[in-house]
């Protein structure tokens, strides 16, 4: 009899735990994805802070020339970064127990792999948690779909690109100047500025900013007056009110006359879908472009594509970009090789 009661109590305890995890009444929704997300993001954040402050130099190129990235080793907030895992490790899974000692693990950049793996798993679960909460509240799933764009971009620079290039040392460093270094080297090696998917991403980000500013300013400019001149216009809104807070007809009429009639949305739902879809699709394309360039399917090459009747090259902006790319590549990993692979062939050298 005692055993039966104990089983019921245990079952009840597990049921209460499940109910608490999946309850939408909690101040912060946890969810089953949150059970994985919370420890992963806490681990990634903790290790990042410790490594950014105190990690010793890392042999990123695998040539016994460590690069300092932490604050205690001479960097500041701008120059500091968590240095990627060493090229000597390549794509091998490199947890602490795979190293002979903690010093070796730190020297080979083990913290970078630990942070990236936990961070990516954490943001994947955050996206799943968005879907899970939407599902339990009876909402549509588009919040998680929109979040998939930055998740795809993070996956491209932290996971897909290192896989394509054969080493985690090619991943994006976790710091400000390290990010810029990654961008410059990416341009030098893959000519990303001439890749159409990157162009779509630029259109998505800048276009999304423009549309967001346009929408916000139009709404703010066509608020329905509910206050006096001596009160803030924001006081005219009460959370949960049924009445419209701005005049969409006035906003539609203004913008339609400013540009032309069909440039203005007359449907609030389709307008907000467009505001979400434009940057999301653009960033999707950027992530896809990064993932293809990871395997060296690079941007367009229009070098020396214009010649005169005598066969002499007429330089275009493509040739100017190519010269800049070569200069950046010469400075990249200058101690790891004597010259970039582009300059190793006689054809490339003769073109210069």
From Swiss-Prot:
Subcellular location: Plastid, Chloroplast thylakoid membrane
Record keyword Membrane present: yes
UniProt keywords, alphabetically: Acetylation, Calcium, Chlorophyll, Chloroplast, Chromophore, Electron transport, Herbicide resistance, Iron, Magnesium, Manganese, Membrane, Metal-binding, Oxidoreductase, Phosphoprotein, Photosynthesis, Photosystem II, Plastid, Thylakoid, Transmembrane, Transmembrane helix, Transport
Bound cofactor: record note: The D1/D2 heterodimer binds P680, chlorophylls that are the primary electron donor of PSII, and subsequent electron acceptors. It shares a non-heme iron and each subunit binds pheophytin, quinone, additional chlorophylls, carotenoids and lipids. D1 provides most of the ligands for the Mn4-Ca-O5 cluster of the oxygen-evolving complex (OEC). There is also a Cl(-1) ion associated with D1 and D2, which is required for oxygen evolution. The PSII complex binds additional chlorophylls, carotenoids and specific lipids.
Site feature location: Stabilizes free radical intermediate: 190
Swiss-Prot/TrEMBL catalytic activity: 2 a plastoquinone + 4 hnu + 2 H2O = 2 a plastoquinol + O2
Protein EC: 1.10.3.9
One Pfam family cited in the UniProt record for this chain: Photo_RC
Top EC class of this enzyme: oxidoreductase
A GO molecular function held by the record: iron ion binding
HAMAP family: PSII_PsbA_D1
NCBIfam families: psbA (TIGR01151)
Official protein name in the record: Photosystem II protein D1
Source organism phylogeny: Eukaryota, Viridiplantae, Chlorophyta, core chlorophytes, Chlorophyceae
């Amino acid at each position: 009899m005692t055993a039966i009661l104990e089983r019921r109590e245990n079952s009840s305890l597990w049921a209460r735990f499940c109910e608490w995890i999946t309850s939408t009444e909690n101040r912060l929704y946890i969810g089953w994805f949150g059970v994985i997300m919370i420890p992963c993001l806490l681990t990634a954040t903790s290790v990042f802070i410790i490594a950014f402050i105190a990690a010793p130099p890392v042999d990123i190129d695998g040539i016994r020339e460590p690069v300092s990235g932490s604050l205690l080793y001479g960097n500041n907030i701008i120059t500091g970064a968590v240095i990627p895992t060493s090229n000597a490790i390549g794509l091998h899974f490199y947890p602490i127990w795979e190293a002979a000692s903690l010093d070796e693990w730190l020297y080979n950049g083990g913290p970078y792999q630990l942070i990236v793996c936990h961070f990516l798993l954490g943001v994947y679960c955050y996206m799943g948690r968005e879907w899970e909460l939407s599902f339990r509240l009876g909402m549509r799933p588009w919040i998680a779909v929109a979040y998939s764009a930055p998740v795809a971009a993070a996956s491209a620079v932290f996971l897909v690109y290192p896989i394509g290039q054969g080493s985690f040392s090619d991943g994006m460093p976790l710091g400000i100047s390290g990010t810029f270094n990654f961008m410059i080297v990416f341009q030098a090696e893959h000519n990303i500025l001439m890749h159409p998917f990157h162009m779509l991403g630029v259109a998505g980000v800048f276009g999304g900013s423009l549309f967001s500013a346009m929408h916000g300013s139009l709404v703010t400019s066509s608020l329905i007056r509910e206050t006096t001149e001596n009160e803030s216009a924001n006081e005219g809104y009460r959370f949960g009110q049924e009445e419209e807070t701005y005049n969409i007809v006035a906003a539609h009429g203004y913008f339609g006359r400013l540009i032309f009639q069909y440039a203005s949305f007359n449907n609030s739902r389709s307008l907000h879908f467009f505001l979400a879809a434009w940057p999301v699709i653009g960033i999707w394309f950027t992530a896809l472009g990064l993932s293809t360039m990871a395997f060296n399917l690079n941007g367009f090459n229009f070098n020396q594509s214009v010649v005169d009747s005598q066969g002499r090259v007429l330089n275009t902006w493509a040739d100017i970009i190519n010269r800049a790319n070569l200069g950046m590549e010469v400075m990249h990993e200058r101690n790891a090789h004597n010259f970039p692979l582009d300059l190793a062939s006689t054809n490339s050298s003769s073109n210069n």
